[in-house]
């Protein structure tokens, strides 16, 4: 694309994929979306002074006279490459985390561990941009133009480490194509986003793109082997002999060996990088302990001492909305908030709550509208099976009837209202 721009001697001052925000001299990318085709807005972009229009190579539409049109084989990848070429950054170390559950927690723990190690770090993900304090479009993985601008600003602040959540949508849509990460990590894969990916196989393949298109020759790869689809993951990655990931919990040098609770303190033994480490936590569910040690393992792959990092475990704050303790009821019951939006995450939250508390567990939850409907009855069954009491409420119904969503969640489940 850059070669064609040079060949056609196109003078431009930026790129845009949104005709509403395009400025005179921008190159407009007419991206075909799931619901809206960007080619519908080409005339609007031209009227606003677009320097050129980029369309998919298969497009056979006619365009207004005197319009410079460039055809791209993969329009999304072309947009990302050009955006990152325009907004260059010099962040030294980049870490990407993908997975159904645990991305935000691992990113949070990585940021915490890097900061206590005296390193400057920025995180981009579900909770927004930790440095710029924004999440303009409420996306885990921002669109390429926005992301490239964010990274440039982060770089200008002399920040050396980037920790980024890589969503399946972001990977499938090539939102950060052109970036190469020093560490690529996978937390787990379970049922989610099938409204978009249609099948679990498509979903897994989207996650695996991180280990194919976003690595350089010295990249470190790590995967938590305690995931339901580990055999499928291994079979996909085996096809590329240059990809040799480390499997956390299946590798004798990277695993948790013991968790013991004494006086409300969890004492944990683990091995990271062949070093035996001891950690202490207070009111941490087991899956968060696993995420914390997974984060230590990631940093060990790029030279950090796990023994030094492990000393900070007891003082680590809980992650916002991840089995986060928020207070007590009038009768003394402890209240935890967890952003469990998948069947596996809901099960983990309830099971871990029972480990932390001796009393009954009452779960209050809901499912979002206009999203994966298949998981609704699954979550209802899980709540019914594992909680002592379950109540279904509304959780951003969007354009769906809230009562219909609640009915689908409850399904044939018992002890749930």
Residue locations for each model-derived region?
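N-terminal leader/targeting and accessory segments in enzymes
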Residues: 1-81, 85, 228, 278-280, ...
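Beta-strand->loop->alpha-helix junctions that form or flank phosphate-binding loops
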Residues: 53-57, 237-262, 280-286, 310-315, ...
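C-terminal helical cap/extension that packs against the catalytic core
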Residues: 53-63, 334, 377-417
